[in-house]
Protein backbone atom coordinates (compact mmCIF):
# COMPACT_ATOMS: atom_id res chain seq x y z
CA UNK A 1 0.00 0.00 0.00
CA UNK A 2 0.87 3.62 -0.32
CA UNK A 3 2.82 4.20 2.77
CA UNK A 4 4.93 1.16 3.42
CA UNK A 5 5.60 0.34 -0.21
CA UNK A 6 5.79 3.46 -2.34
CA UNK A 7 8.00 6.41 -1.57
CA UNK A 8 6.79 7.88 -4.85
CA UNK A 9 9.87 9.98 -5.53
CA UNK A 10 9.05 11.65 -8.81
CA UNK A 11 12.21 13.69 -8.36
CA UNK A 12 12.47 17.39 -8.98
CA UNK A 13 16.18 17.19 -9.93
CA UNK A 14 18.93 14.69 -10.80
CA UNK A 15 19.48 13.56 -7.24
CA UNK A 16 18.06 10.40 -5.74
CA UNK A 17 19.18 11.22 -2.20
CA UNK A 18 17.51 8.75 0.14
CA UNK A 19 19.11 7.15 3.19
CA UNK A 20 17.00 4.90 5.41
CA UNK A 21 17.75 3.90 8.98
CA UNK A 22 18.76 0.28 9.65
CA UNK A 23 16.39 -2.50 10.68
CA UNK A 24 15.02 -1.59 14.12
CA UNK A 25 14.28 -5.16 15.23
CA UNK A 26 17.04 -7.23 13.59
CA UNK A 27 16.70 -10.80 14.90
CA UNK A 28 14.80 -9.83 18.08
CA UNK A 29 11.90 -12.21 17.42
CA UNK A 30 14.16 -15.26 17.20
CA UNK A 31 13.88 -15.36 21.01
CA UNK A 32 10.26 -16.46 20.68
CA UNK A 33 10.92 -20.18 20.44
CA UNK A 34 8.21 -22.82 20.27
CA UNK A 35 8.54 -23.30 24.04
CA UNK A 36 7.91 -19.61 24.74
CA UNK A 37 4.96 -19.35 22.35
CA UNK A 38 3.29 -22.62 23.33
CA UNK A 39 -0.23 -22.26 24.71
CA UNK A 40 -1.02 -24.71 27.50
CA UNK A 41 -4.10 -26.92 27.53
CA UNK A 42 -5.22 -25.21 30.74
CA UNK A 43 -5.09 -21.76 29.09
CA UNK A 44 -7.05 -23.01 26.08
CA UNK A 45 -9.73 -24.51 28.35
CA UNK A 46 -9.96 -21.32 30.41
CA UNK A 47 -10.24 -19.29 27.21
CA UNK A 48 -13.08 -21.49 25.95
CA UNK A 49 -14.91 -21.34 29.30
CA UNK A 50 -14.80 -17.54 29.43
CA UNK A 51 -15.81 -17.26 25.78
CA UNK A 52 -18.94 -19.33 26.35
CA UNK A 53 -19.85 -17.25 29.42
CA UNK A 54 -19.79 -14.12 27.26
CA UNK A 55 -21.76 -15.83 24.50
CA UNK A 56 -24.45 -16.69 27.05
CA UNK A 57 -24.43 -13.10 28.33
CA UNK A 58 -24.95 -11.84 24.78
CA UNK A 59 -27.83 -14.22 24.12
CA UNK A 60 -29.54 -13.54 27.44
CA UNK A 61 -29.41 -9.73 27.25
CA UNK A 62 -32.52 -8.26 25.60
CA UNK A 63 -31.96 -6.67 22.19
CA UNK A 64 -34.24 -3.74 23.04
CA UNK A 65 -32.12 -2.67 26.01
CA UNK A 66 -29.41 -0.06 26.34
CA UNK A 67 -27.38 -2.73 28.12
CA UNK A 68 -27.27 -4.78 24.89
CA UNK A 69 -25.93 -1.82 22.93
CA UNK A 70 -23.24 -1.18 25.53
CA UNK A 71 -22.36 -4.88 25.66
CA UNK A 72 -21.95 -5.14 21.88
CA UNK A 73 -19.91 -1.93 21.80
CA UNK A 74 -17.57 -3.13 24.54
CA UNK A 75 -17.09 -6.56 22.92
CA UNK A 76 -16.21 -5.01 19.58
CA UNK A 77 -13.90 -2.36 20.98
CA UNK A 78 -12.09 -4.87 23.18
CA UNK A 79 -11.16 -6.77 20.02
CA UNK A 80 -13.09 -9.95 20.80
CA UNK A 81 -16.02 -9.41 18.43
CA UNK A 82 -14.61 -11.98 15.98
CA UNK A 83 -15.68 -14.73 18.39
CA UNK A 84 -19.31 -13.59 18.35
CA UNK A 85 -19.93 -12.29 14.84
CA UNK A 86 -23.17 -14.21 14.26
CA UNK A 87 -24.68 -13.27 17.63
CA UNK A 88 -23.77 -9.59 17.20
CA UNK A 89 -25.06 -9.45 13.63
CA UNK A 90 -28.38 -11.07 14.57
CA UNK A 91 -28.87 -8.71 17.52
CA UNK A 92 -28.14 -5.57 15.51
CA UNK A 93 -30.33 -6.81 12.66
CA UNK A 94 -33.15 -7.30 15.16
CA UNK A 95 -32.60 -3.86 16.69
CA UNK A 96 -32.61 -2.26 13.23
CA UNK A 97 -35.74 -4.14 12.09
CA UNK A 98 -37.94 -4.09 15.16
CA UNK A 99 -36.67 -1.94 18.00
CA UNK A 100 -39.69 0.10 19.13
CA UNK A 101 -37.63 2.76 20.93
CA UNK A 102 -35.43 3.64 17.96
CA UNK A 103 -37.16 6.99 17.44
CA UNK A 104 -38.53 7.47 20.94
CA UNK A 105 -38.85 11.10 22.02
CA UNK A 106 -37.16 10.40 25.37
CA UNK A 107 -34.05 8.89 23.78
CA UNK A 108 -30.95 10.58 25.14
CA UNK A 109 -28.12 11.57 22.82
CA UNK A 110 -25.65 9.04 24.21
CA UNK A 111 -27.96 6.08 23.51
CA UNK A 112 -29.32 7.39 20.19
CA UNK A 113 -25.82 8.00 18.81
CA UNK A 114 -24.49 4.67 20.06
CA UNK A 115 -27.39 2.78 18.50
CA UNK A 116 -27.01 4.62 15.19
CA UNK A 117 -23.27 4.00 15.05
CA UNK A 118 -23.48 0.29 15.85
CA UNK A 119 -26.21 -0.26 13.25
CA UNK A 120 -24.49 1.80 10.53
CA UNK A 121 -21.15 0.17 11.34
CA UNK A 122 -22.78 -3.25 10.84
CA UNK A 123 -23.86 -2.20 7.35
CA UNK A 124 -27.54 -1.46 7.98
CA UNK A 125 -28.82 1.84 6.50
CA UNK A 126 -29.70 3.58 9.77
CA UNK A 127 -31.36 6.96 9.03
CA UNK A 128 -29.59 10.06 10.33
CA UNK A 129 -32.98 11.72 10.91
CA UNK A 130 -32.86 10.24 14.42
CA UNK A 131 -30.65 13.20 15.39
CA UNK A 132 -33.12 15.90 14.35
CA UNK A 133 -34.69 15.80 17.81
CA UNK A 134 -31.43 17.24 19.16
CA UNK A 135 -31.50 20.25 16.81
CA UNK A 136 -33.54 23.46 17.26
CA UNK A 137 -35.62 25.31 14.65
CA UNK A 138 -32.55 27.20 13.40
CA UNK A 139 -30.73 23.94 12.74
CA UNK A 140 -28.34 24.36 15.67
CA UNK A 141 -27.78 21.71 18.31
CA UNK A 142 -29.82 22.41 21.44
CA UNK A 143 -27.98 24.08 24.32
CA UNK A 144 -28.23 21.13 26.72
CA UNK A 145 -26.43 18.93 24.19
CA UNK A 146 -23.35 21.16 24.33
CA UNK A 147 -22.20 19.95 27.76
CA UNK A 148 -23.04 16.24 27.46
CA UNK A 149 -19.52 14.83 26.98
CA UNK A 150 -20.58 11.19 26.59
CA UNK A 151 -23.38 12.14 24.24
CA UNK A 152 -21.08 14.34 22.17
CA UNK A 153 -18.44 11.60 22.02
CA UNK A 154 -20.96 9.06 20.74
CA UNK A 155 -22.35 11.57 18.24
CA UNK A 156 -18.81 12.35 17.05
CA UNK A 157 -18.13 8.65 16.49
CA UNK A 158 -21.48 8.22 14.71
CA UNK A 159 -20.91 11.22 12.44
CA UNK A 160 -17.68 9.66 11.13
CA UNK A 161 -19.85 7.05 9.39
CA UNK A 162 -21.59 9.74 7.32
CA UNK A 163 -22.27 9.32 3.61
CA UNK A 164 -22.78 12.05 1.02
CA UNK A 165 -25.81 14.27 1.60
CA UNK A 166 -26.08 13.78 5.37
CA UNK A 167 -25.73 17.43 6.34
CA UNK A 168 -26.77 16.90 9.94
CA UNK A 169 -23.86 14.49 10.44
CA UNK A 170 -21.42 16.86 8.74
CA UNK A 171 -22.54 19.60 11.10
CA UNK A 172 -22.38 17.20 14.05
CA UNK A 173 -18.78 16.25 13.26
CA UNK A 174 -17.60 19.85 13.31
CA UNK A 175 -19.73 20.77 16.35
CA UNK A 176 -18.67 17.75 18.42
CA UNK A 177 -14.98 18.09 17.56
CA UNK A 178 -14.87 21.68 18.83
CA UNK A 179 -17.00 21.06 21.94
CA UNK A 180 -15.16 17.91 22.99
CA UNK A 181 -11.79 19.61 22.66
CA UNK A 182 -13.02 22.47 24.82
CA UNK A 183 -14.82 20.39 27.46
CA UNK A 184 -11.94 17.98 28.09
CA UNK A 185 -9.23 20.59 28.58
CA UNK A 186 -7.48 19.77 31.84
CA UNK A 187 -9.48 16.58 32.42
CA UNK A 188 -7.54 13.37 33.18
CA UNK A 189 -10.24 10.75 33.74
CA UNK A 190 -11.10 7.69 31.63
CA UNK A 191 -13.71 9.58 29.61
CA UNK A 192 -11.31 12.37 28.67
CA UNK A 193 -8.75 9.76 27.57
CA UNK A 194 -11.37 8.20 25.30
CA UNK A 195 -12.21 11.62 23.86
CA UNK A 196 -8.59 12.49 23.12
CA UNK A 197 -8.01 9.13 21.44
CA UNK A 198 -11.19 9.48 19.37
CA UNK A 199 -10.25 12.97 18.18
CA UNK A 200 -6.94 11.54 16.95
CA UNK A 201 -8.44 8.49 15.21
CA UNK A 202 -12.20 7.77 15.39
CA UNK A 203 -13.59 4.22 15.52
CA UNK A 204 -14.42 4.32 11.81
CA UNK A 205 -10.69 4.59 11.03
CA UNK A 206 -9.32 2.43 13.87
CA UNK A 207 -7.60 -0.93 13.40
CA UNK A 208 -9.25 -3.58 15.58
CA UNK A 209 -6.13 -5.03 17.21
CA UNK A 210 -4.38 -1.76 18.01
CA UNK A 211 -7.65 -0.10 18.99
CA UNK A 212 -8.38 -2.93 21.42
CA UNK A 213 -4.98 -2.59 23.07
CA UNK A 214 -5.56 1.10 23.69
CA UNK A 215 -9.22 0.73 24.68
CA UNK A 216 -8.51 -1.90 27.37
CA UNK A 217 -6.41 0.51 29.41
CA UNK A 218 -9.22 3.09 29.31
CA UNK A 219 -12.03 0.55 29.81
CA UNK A 220 -10.56 -0.86 33.01
CA UNK A 221 -10.46 2.65 34.51
CA UNK A 222 -14.21 2.95 33.95
CA UNK A 223 -15.99 2.02 37.19
CA UNK A 224 -18.87 0.46 35.25
CA UNK A 225 -16.66 -1.92 33.25
CA UNK A 226 -17.59 -5.59 32.93
CA UNK A 227 -14.86 -7.65 34.60
CA UNK A 228 -15.78 -10.81 32.65
CA UNK A 229 -15.35 -9.02 29.33
CA UNK A 230 -12.11 -7.37 30.36
CA UNK A 231 -10.50 -10.57 31.64
CA UNK A 232 -11.44 -12.51 28.52
CA UNK A 233 -10.22 -9.70 26.25
CA UNK A 234 -6.84 -9.67 28.01
CA UNK A 235 -6.52 -13.46 27.89
CA UNK A 236 -7.50 -13.54 24.22
CA UNK A 237 -5.07 -10.74 23.39
CA UNK A 238 -2.17 -12.55 25.05
CA UNK A 239 -2.92 -15.91 23.45
CA UNK A 240 -3.22 -14.40 19.97
CA UNK A 241 -0.03 -12.42 20.59
CA UNK A 242 1.82 -15.70 21.17
CA UNK A 243 0.64 -16.92 17.76
CA UNK A 244 1.91 -13.70 16.18
CA UNK A 245 5.28 -14.00 17.93
CA UNK A 246 5.68 -17.56 16.66
CA UNK A 247 4.99 -16.39 13.10
CA UNK A 248 7.46 -13.52 13.48
CA UNK A 249 10.11 -16.00 14.55
CA UNK A 250 9.62 -17.85 11.24
CA UNK A 251 9.54 -14.63 9.20
CA UNK A 252 12.75 -13.43 10.88
CA UNK A 253 14.46 -16.68 9.84
CA UNK A 254 13.33 -16.10 6.25
CA UNK A 255 14.58 -12.51 6.39
CA UNK A 256 18.00 -13.57 7.71
CA UNK A 257 18.38 -16.10 4.91
CA UNK A 258 17.67 -13.38 2.32
CA UNK A 259 20.40 -11.18 3.82
CA UNK A 260 19.07 -8.11 2.00
CA UNK A 261 20.82 -5.88 4.55
CA UNK A 262 24.11 -6.98 2.99
CA UNK A 263 23.03 -7.57 -0.61
CA UNK A 264 20.62 -4.62 -1.01
CA UNK A 265 21.80 -2.17 1.70
CA UNK A 266 20.09 0.82 0.06
CA UNK A 267 16.56 -0.52 0.69
CA UNK A 268 14.20 -0.07 3.62
CA UNK A 269 14.68 -3.15 5.79
CA UNK A 270 11.30 -3.45 7.53
CA UNK A 271 10.04 -7.07 7.84
CA UNK A 272 8.56 -6.61 11.33
CA UNK A 273 6.85 -3.37 10.32
CA UNK A 274 5.35 -5.19 7.32
CA UNK A 275 4.03 -7.93 9.60
CA UNK A 276 2.55 -5.30 11.94
CA UNK A 277 0.78 -3.80 8.96
CA UNK A 278 -0.83 -7.13 8.06
CA UNK A 279 -1.84 -7.78 11.68
CA UNK A 280 -3.80 -4.55 11.36
CA UNK A 281 -5.95 -6.22 8.71
CA UNK A 282 -5.86 -9.94 9.53
CA UNK A 283 -5.04 -10.54 13.21
CA UNK A 284 -7.29 -13.56 13.83
CA UNK A 285 -5.51 -16.91 14.39
CA UNK A 286 -7.03 -18.54 11.29
CA UNK A 287 -5.20 -16.15 8.95
CA UNK A 288 -1.68 -17.38 9.79
CA UNK A 289 -0.75 -18.49 6.25
CA UNK A 290 -2.02 -15.22 4.79
CA UNK A 291 -0.07 -13.15 7.35
CA UNK A 292 3.17 -14.96 6.56
CA UNK A 293 2.81 -14.73 2.78
CA UNK A 294 1.59 -11.13 2.80
CA UNK A 295 4.42 -10.00 5.07
CA UNK A 296 6.92 -11.41 2.59
CA UNK A 297 5.08 -9.80 -0.33
CA UNK A 298 4.89 -6.37 1.30
CA UNK A 299 8.54 -6.54 2.28
CA UNK A 300 9.54 -7.46 -1.27
CA UNK A 301 7.28 -4.76 -2.73
CA UNK A 302 8.92 -2.19 -0.46
CA UNK A 303 12.38 -3.27 -1.62
CA UNK A 304 11.15 -3.28 -5.23
CA UNK A 305 10.13 0.35 -4.85
CA UNK A 306 13.58 1.24 -3.53
CA UNK A 307 15.30 -0.54 -6.42
CA UNK A 308 13.38 1.68 -8.84
CA UNK A 309 13.38 4.76 -6.70
CA UNK A 310 16.85 5.14 -5.25
CA UNK A 311 19.35 2.71 -6.74
CA UNK A 312 18.83 1.09 -10.15
CA UNK A 313 20.14 2.73 -13.32
CA UNK A 314 17.69 3.27 -16.17
CA UNK A 315 19.39 0.55 -18.25
CA UNK A 316 19.22 -1.93 -15.37
CA UNK A 317 15.60 -1.06 -14.62
CA UNK A 318 14.57 -1.54 -18.25
CA UNK A 319 15.80 -5.15 -18.34
CA UNK A 320 14.60 -5.75 -14.76
CA UNK A 321 11.06 -4.65 -15.67
CA UNK A 322 11.01 -6.85 -18.76
CA UNK A 323 11.98 -9.91 -16.72
CA UNK A 324 9.30 -9.25 -14.10
CA UNK A 325 6.76 -8.58 -16.86
CA UNK A 326 7.53 -11.98 -18.42
CA UNK A 327 8.04 -13.59 -14.98
CA UNK A 328 11.10 -15.16 -16.54
CA UNK A 329 13.47 -16.75 -14.03
CA UNK A 330 15.63 -18.13 -16.86
CA UNK A 331 16.59 -14.59 -17.91
CA UNK A 332 17.92 -13.48 -14.52
CA UNK A 333 21.54 -13.91 -15.69
CA UNK A 334 21.11 -10.65 -17.62
CA UNK A 335 20.77 -8.76 -14.33
CA UNK A 336 23.38 -7.38 -11.93
CA UNK A 337 23.86 -9.53 -8.79
CA UNK A 338 21.62 -7.49 -6.47
CA UNK A 339 18.71 -7.70 -8.93
CA UNK A 340 19.22 -11.44 -9.41
CA UNK A 341 19.05 -11.95 -5.65
CA UNK A 342 15.88 -9.89 -5.51
CA UNK A 343 14.16 -11.67 -8.43
CA UNK A 344 14.88 -15.10 -7.00
CA UNK A 345 13.31 -14.08 -3.67
CA UNK A 346 10.26 -12.65 -5.45
CA UNK A 347 9.67 -15.68 -7.67
CA UNK A 348 10.23 -18.06 -4.73
CA UNK A 349 7.52 -16.39 -2.64
CA UNK A 350 4.97 -16.80 -5.42
CA UNK A 351 5.96 -20.47 -5.77
CA UNK A 352 5.28 -20.78 -2.05
CA UNK A 353 1.93 -19.04 -2.58
CA UNK A 354 0.99 -21.49 -5.34
CA UNK A 355 1.81 -24.43 -3.07
CA UNK A 356 -0.21 -23.08 -0.13
CA UNK A 357 -3.19 -22.05 -2.24
CA UNK A 358 -3.18 -25.44 -3.94
CA UNK A 359 -3.87 -27.01 -0.55
CA UNK A 360 -7.16 -25.09 -0.27
CA UNK A 361 -8.12 -25.28 -3.95
CA UNK A 362 -7.41 -21.63 -4.60
CA UNK A 363 -4.60 -21.94 -7.16
CA UNK A 364 -6.67 -20.04 -9.73
CA UNK A 365 -6.26 -16.87 -7.66
CA UNK A 366 -2.45 -16.79 -7.77
CA UNK A 367 -2.40 -15.52 -11.35
CA UNK A 368 -4.40 -12.45 -10.26
CA UNK A 369 -1.81 -11.81 -7.54
CA UNK A 370 1.12 -12.09 -9.96
CA UNK A 371 -0.51 -9.75 -12.47
CA UNK A 372 -0.86 -7.03 -9.85
CA UNK A 373 2.77 -7.39 -8.79
CA UNK A 374 3.78 -7.04 -12.45
CA UNK A 375 1.58 -3.96 -12.80
CA UNK A 376 3.15 -2.46 -9.69
CA UNK A 377 6.61 -2.89 -11.22
CA UNK A 378 5.41 -1.23 -14.45
CA UNK A 379 4.18 1.82 -12.51
CA UNK A 380 7.42 2.05 -10.54
CA UNK A 381 9.27 1.95 -13.86
CA UNK A 382 7.12 4.76 -15.25
CA UNK A 383 7.92 6.92 -12.22
CA UNK A 384 11.63 6.11 -12.60
CA UNK A 385 11.52 7.16 -16.27
CA UNK A 386 9.94 10.46 -15.25
CA UNK A 387 12.66 10.99 -12.65
CA UNK A 388 15.56 10.22 -15.00
CA UNK A 389 14.15 12.47 -17.74
CA UNK A 390 13.16 15.24 -15.27
CA UNK A 391 9.63 15.06 -16.65
CA UNK A 392 6.93 16.72 -14.57
CA UNK A 393 3.60 14.99 -15.26
CA UNK A 394 0.23 16.68 -15.12
CA UNK A 395 -2.00 15.97 -12.13
CA UNK A 396 -4.04 13.58 -14.29
CA UNK A 397 -0.94 11.72 -15.52
CA UNK A 398 0.45 11.58 -12.00
CA UNK A 399 -2.68 10.10 -10.43
CA UNK A 400 -3.12 7.52 -13.21
CA UNK A 401 0.25 6.06 -12.23
CA UNK A 402 0.41 6.98 -8.54
CA UNK A 403 -2.89 5.34 -7.58
CA UNK A 404 -1.41 2.02 -8.72
CA UNK A 405 2.16 2.67 -7.51
CA UNK A 406 0.70 3.20 -4.04
CA UNK A 407 0.65 -0.59 -3.94
CA UNK A 408 -2.91 -0.63 -2.61
CA UNK A 409 -4.42 -2.58 -5.51
CA UNK A 410 -1.58 -5.09 -5.48
CA UNK A 411 -1.99 -5.66 -1.76
CA UNK A 412 -5.77 -5.99 -1.97
CA UNK A 413 -5.58 -8.64 -4.68
CA UNK A 414 -2.71 -10.49 -3.00
CA UNK A 415 -4.48 -10.51 0.36
CA UNK A 416 -7.73 -11.85 -1.09
CA UNK A 417 -5.64 -14.50 -2.85
CA UNK A 418 -3.94 -15.72 0.31
CA UNK A 419 -6.78 -15.77 2.85
CA UNK A 420 -8.72 -18.99 3.37
CA UNK A 421 -12.05 -17.38 2.47
CA UNK A 422 -13.36 -18.24 -0.98
CA UNK A 423 -13.11 -15.34 -3.44
CA UNK A 424 -14.57 -16.15 -6.84
CA UNK A 425 -13.11 -15.14 -10.20
CA UNK A 426 -16.13 -12.86 -10.68
CA UNK A 427 -15.25 -11.10 -7.42
CA UNK A 428 -11.60 -10.67 -8.43
CA UNK A 429 -12.72 -9.17 -11.73
CA UNK A 430 -15.13 -6.86 -9.88
CA UNK A 431 -12.27 -5.53 -7.75
CA UNK A 432 -10.03 -5.08 -10.79
CA UNK A 433 -12.76 -3.00 -12.44
CA UNK A 434 -12.01 -0.39 -9.72
CA UNK A 435 -15.51 0.03 -8.25
CA UNK A 436 -16.28 3.15 -6.23
CA UNK A 437 -15.02 1.80 -2.89
CA UNK A 438 -11.72 0.72 -4.48
CA UNK A 439 -11.29 4.05 -6.25
CA UNK A 440 -12.03 5.91 -3.02
CA UNK A 441 -9.58 3.81 -1.03
CA UNK A 442 -6.88 4.21 -3.68
CA UNK A 443 -7.41 7.97 -3.48
CA UNK A 444 -7.21 8.06 0.32
CA UNK A 445 -4.05 5.97 0.53
CA UNK A 446 -2.24 7.88 -2.22
CA UNK A 447 -3.16 11.34 -0.97
CA UNK A 448 -2.53 10.55 2.72
CA UNK A 449 0.95 9.44 1.67
CA UNK A 450 1.40 12.63 -0.36
CA UNK A 451 0.35 14.91 2.50
CA UNK A 452 2.66 13.14 4.95
CA UNK A 453 5.58 13.25 2.51
CA UNK A 454 5.09 16.84 1.36
CA UNK A 455 8.24 18.85 1.89
CA UNK A 456 10.57 15.85 1.66
CA UNK A 457 13.59 16.82 -0.42
CA UNK A 458 13.25 15.75 -4.03
CA UNK A 459 9.78 14.28 -3.62
CA UNK A 460 6.86 15.51 -5.71
CA UNK A 461 3.25 14.92 -4.74
CA UNK A 462 -0.37 15.78 -5.48
CA UNK A 463 0.10 18.98 -3.48
CA UNK A 464 2.83 20.19 -5.86
CA UNK A 465 0.83 19.31 -8.95
CA UNK A 466 -2.35 20.94 -7.65
CA UNK A 467 -0.50 24.14 -6.78
CA UNK A 468 1.19 24.28 -10.19
CA UNK A 469 -1.93 23.57 -12.25
CA UNK A 470 -4.32 25.81 -10.31
CA UNK A 471 -2.01 28.63 -9.27
CA UNK A 472 -2.96 28.35 -5.59
CA UNK A 473 -1.01 28.58 -2.36
CA UNK A 474 0.33 25.65 -0.38
CA UNK A 475 -2.40 26.10 2.24
CA UNK A 476 -5.15 26.10 -0.39
CA UNK A 477 -3.70 22.98 -2.02
CA UNK A 478 -3.56 21.18 1.33
CA UNK A 479 -7.18 22.14 2.01
CA UNK A 480 -8.29 20.87 -1.39
CA UNK A 481 -6.43 17.56 -1.11
CA UNK A 482 -7.77 17.08 2.44
CA UNK A 483 -11.27 17.73 1.11
CA UNK A 484 -10.81 15.05 -1.56
CA UNK A 485 -9.80 12.58 1.18
CA UNK A 486 -12.86 13.43 3.30
CA UNK A 487 -15.15 12.97 0.31
CA UNK A 488 -13.52 9.63 -0.49
CA UNK A 489 -14.19 8.41 3.05
CA UNK A 490 -17.89 9.12 2.52
CA UNK A 491 -17.74 6.95 -0.60
CA UNK A 492 -16.16 4.17 1.46
CA UNK A 493 -18.85 4.51 4.13
CA UNK A 494 -21.63 4.43 1.55
CA UNK A 495 -20.33 1.27 -0.10
CA UNK A 496 -20.31 -0.55 3.26
CA UNK A 497 -24.05 0.03 3.80
CA UNK A 498 -26.70 -2.35 2.46
CA UNK A 499 -27.42 -3.04 -0.33
CA UNK A 500 -23.72 -3.81 -0.79
CA UNK A 501 -21.97 -4.68 -4.03
CA UNK A 502 -19.48 -7.06 -2.42
CA UNK A 503 -19.12 -9.53 0.43
CA UNK A 504 -18.17 -8.49 3.94
CA UNK A 505 -14.82 -10.27 3.46
CA UNK A 506 -13.89 -8.05 0.51
CA UNK A 507 -15.18 -4.85 2.08
CA UNK A 508 -13.33 -5.50 5.31
CA UNK A 509 -10.09 -6.04 3.39
CA UNK A 510 -10.52 -2.79 1.47
CA UNK A 511 -11.44 -0.71 4.53
CA UNK A 512 -8.80 -2.11 6.88
CA UNK A 513 -5.97 -1.58 4.41
CA UNK A 514 -7.13 2.03 4.17
CA UNK A 515 -7.12 2.29 7.97
CA UNK A 516 -3.50 1.15 8.05
CA UNK A 517 -2.55 4.18 5.96
CA UNK A 518 -4.46 6.52 8.28
CA UNK A 519 -2.46 5.12 11.18
CA UNK A 520 0.95 5.27 9.48
CA UNK A 521 0.43 8.59 7.69
CA UNK A 522 -1.83 10.64 9.95
CA UNK A 523 1.00 13.00 10.92
CA UNK A 524 4.28 11.59 9.56
CA UNK A 525 5.81 8.83 7.43
CA UNK A 526 5.83 6.21 10.18
CA UNK A 527 7.12 3.49 7.84
CA UNK A 528 10.07 5.33 6.36
CA UNK A 529 10.94 6.38 9.92
CA UNK A 530 9.88 3.46 12.10
CA UNK A 531 12.21 4.16 15.05
CA UNK A 532 9.74 6.03 17.26
CA UNK A 533 5.95 5.94 16.84
CA UNK A 534 5.87 2.68 14.87
CA UNK A 535 8.30 0.97 17.22
CA UNK A 536 6.08 1.83 20.19
CA UNK A 537 2.97 0.57 18.38
CA UNK A 538 4.70 -2.70 17.48
CA UNK A 539 5.79 -3.18 21.10
CA UNK A 540 2.24 -2.68 22.34
CA UNK A 541 0.76 -5.21 19.92
CA UNK A 542 3.49 -7.78 19.27
CA UNK A 543 5.86 -7.66 22.26
CA UNK A 544 4.26 -6.56 25.53
CA UNK A 545 1.61 -8.92 26.97
CA UNK A 546 -1.27 -7.58 29.05
CA UNK A 547 -1.21 -8.03 32.81
CA UNK A 548 -4.23 -10.06 33.92
Curated annotation (Swiss-Prot):
Pathway: Secondary metabolite biosynthesis; terpenoid biosynthesis. Mg(2+) 3 binds at residues 449, 457. CDD domains: Terpene_cyclase_plant_C1. (2E,6E)-farnesyl diphosphate binds at residues 268, 305, 309, 446, 449. Its cofactor is Mg(2+). Binds 3 Mg(2+) ions per subunit. GO terms for biological process: beta-caryophyllene biosynthetic process; diterpenoid biosynthetic process. Mg(2+) 2 binds at residues 305, 309. GO terms for molecular function: (-)-E-beta-caryophyllene synthase activity; magnesium ion binding. Keywords: Lyase, Magnesium, Metal-binding. Sesquiterpene synthase that catalyzes the formation of sesquiterpenes and sesquiterpenoid alcohols. Converts farnesyl diphosphate (FPP) to beta-caryophyllene. Can use geranyl diphosphate (GPP) to produce myrcene, limonene and camphene. This is Beta-caryophyllene synthase. It comes from Lavandula angustifolia (Lavender).
Amino acid sequence: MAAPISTNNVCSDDARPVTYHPNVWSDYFLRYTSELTEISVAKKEEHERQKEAIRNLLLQTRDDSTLKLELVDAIQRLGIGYHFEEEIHNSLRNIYDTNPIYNAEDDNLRVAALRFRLIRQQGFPAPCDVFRKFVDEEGEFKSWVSNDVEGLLNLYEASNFAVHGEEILEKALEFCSLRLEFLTQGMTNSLSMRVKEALKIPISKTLTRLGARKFMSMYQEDESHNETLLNFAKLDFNLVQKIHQKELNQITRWWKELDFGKNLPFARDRPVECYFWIVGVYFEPRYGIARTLLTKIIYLASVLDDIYDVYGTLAELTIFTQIIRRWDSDAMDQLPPYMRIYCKALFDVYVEMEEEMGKIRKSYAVEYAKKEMKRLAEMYFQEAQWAFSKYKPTMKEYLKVALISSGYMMMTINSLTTIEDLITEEEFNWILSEPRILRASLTITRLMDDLAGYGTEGKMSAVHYYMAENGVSEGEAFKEVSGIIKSAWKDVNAECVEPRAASTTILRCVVDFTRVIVLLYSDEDAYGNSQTKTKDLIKSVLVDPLII
